[in-house]
Amino acid sequence: VGRALIADSADRVLKVSMELGGNAPFIVFEDADLDKAVDGAMLAKLRNMGEACTAANRMIVHESVAAEFSKRLADKMAKLKVSRGTEDGANIGPLIDDKSRNTVHALVADAVSKGAKVLTGGAIPTGEGYFYPPTVLVDVPVNAEILKEEIFGPVAPVVTFKNEDEAVKIANSTEYGLIAYAFTKDLN
């Protein structure tokens, strides 16, 4: 679609700026301030219910802090109110449509079927609307589709790394390279 739009725009000599998709890594190093990292993850993952090409898609967390980071993230996400934006206290609204919600849930179900564990969320709620709860997955295997595809929903799959080289390798293991997030006290 992007190529077709660019070609059409070029034929008419139009300026073009496009956001064509992302699979943003959110890297948390062992020296990161976990409170700041969790707050950053909440913002980077849940802006517009995760339906943004710049949303953090894959939480890549050093193995020494992964359990604590995942627990804190799941605890914060579990406290969010999923409802219509017109309701008092609403934090997370619906996804754009039923197809999108089903796609998000299929990615979660695929990860779980391959061994991922759900810390919070992970199920389509009953009732009206295209709601999907904020979800944290841990022990996500590398062959899970959720690590390869843009999620476009409020789901945070957590994978671990042992060293910086491995973190970079995991972060770069996608064809989408729009944006990346990193939490560390040492940028060197």
Feature roles, as predicted:
Residues 180-183:
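Short amphipathic N-terminal alpha-helix
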Residues 143-148:
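Cytochrome P450 core scaffold surrounding the K-helix E-X-X-R motif
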Residues 157-159:
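Active-site donor-binding acidic/aromatic loop of nucleotide-activated sugar
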Residues 90-91, 129-132, 149-155, 174-178:
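Conserved glycine-rich beta-strand-loop-beta hairpin in the small C-terminal domain of fold type I
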